[in-house]
Amino acid sequence: MTITITDRAFERIYELIELEKDKNLVLRVSVDSGGCSGLMYNYELVSKDNIEKDDYVFTRHNATIIIDSISQKFMLNCTLDFIEELGSSYFNVSNPQAKAKCGCGNSFSV
């Protein structure tokens, strides 16, 4: 699977895990139906015990990201980054497969 995950994204995941004080956590990124355009990215800290055999697993900077097999096809050639702007911070997926985004930027279609 080809996906780029920036150092900033891994560093932020590590910070979130440190805040939870549970080294057994990983970030699950998934694509689910929802939003104005039909598909949305979801981010959830879950236990390493929840890693499935067909999950794609990325580990760097003492942080792990997992993507389920269904979501993988929607995330091919994507870049996952963590953005800090004036007054807000968020994970951002740049997806070359996205044909449209909703006005608020929270959902997309392929």
Curated annotation (Swiss-Prot):
InterPro entries: FeS_biogenesis, FeS_cluster_insertion, FeS_cluster_insertion_CS, HesB-like_dom_sf. GO terms for biological process: iron-sulfur cluster assembly. SUPFAM superfamilies: HesB-like domain. GO terms for molecular function: 2 iron, 2 sulfur cluster binding; 4 iron, 4 sulfur cluster binding; iron ion binding. Belongs to the HesB/IscA family. This is Uncharacterized protein RP063. It comes from Rickettsia prowazekii (strain Madrid E).
